[in-house]
């Protein structure tokens, strides 16, 4: 039993420990260090943003020319990382997020060619974690860099090492960092999912021979277990991030070969939501006793092609349908799959949620703000921020909105004054 001054000292120690535990969360709450934000769920938790802006749009802070690619920016501790292609080199640029000024550059040659004539730049959003930057290039090169200097720490040619095919549109899955491991859906015959040591790049474990998807994996506590959740080319793979052992799988993919799984899985308590296009649709899975069973499924609720839906208060907001055929924007009740509202012909895009506001970037380059409400859709504000085509995921960090097309990266101020 603790008594007297010992109790007081113990209480102070506990308070200090709590402060140390909470401090990192406070520091990173304003960051956007990876695809879909700090928790890979599309939710912004930084300083409040404006619910609307003037007809001319929010104030532009800076702009700069960039190379090819669909990889959106990542932002951490005031540093923005952009992964793009200039001529025949894949380039990682670190910039001051406040000014756009270059801090350092790392580059290496690439020979990637798109078989369908699309953009040939990198597709995967970089990850900033533990003082390092991790990039996954269109031709499969995985790099670990020092975030302060850009110094190359290690690199792995994942396609060669794990005998992975090129894929329909190149390599496009963002790495997942969990502690000392970097996990990637490599899609190789000798390693479908691979964990690398974050410091050295050495292989820690391999699991499955599933093909690579374009979906970003997530890590979460599910049914009391810390679990890495991948939506591979075949479907759901949930595994132990410590050793790669498979906990459960569920096949979910289109019947046609020329298709992709691209939306990130969404984990809510002990349930997992998956969505794909090409007539596949969505499924909500219940996890229990290291197994999964469907709660509901169907192609009539939310058919995500490339863009991931965002969950808010039990409702999914996202883009339904094939990108090239014209998409609708809709709201779906997660528990039932019921469509609450639908805006037909809205067009493709991406979205995130800040407080109760949908922050929508349309493929045309128009930014739209709207209430995140299942009661219906209405615009609060809309403005053209840059010319289309905009397919890269934007980043929202410390009230600044960073968005790129195939030629420029621009920063805008959305901070509520």
Residue ranges and their predicted role:
Residues 11-25:
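Bacterial N-terminal signal peptides
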Residues 30-65, 81, 91-93, 98-115, ...:
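Aromatic (tryptophan-biased) beta-strands that constitute blades/sheets of beta-rich domains
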Residues 37-40, 85-87, 138, 187-188, ...:
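Short loop/turn segments immediately following the C-termini of beta-strands
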Residues 61-74, 105-127, 155-177, 187-190, ...:
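Extracytoplasmic beta-rich repeat domains
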Residues 77-78, 130-131, 179-180, 225-226, ...:
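Short coil/turn segments that connect the beta-strands within blades of beta-propeller domains
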Residues 80-82, 135, 184, 230, ...:
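Residue position within the beta-strands of beta-propeller blades
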Residues 96, 146, 197, 240, ...:
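Structural recognition of the beta-propeller blade-terminating site
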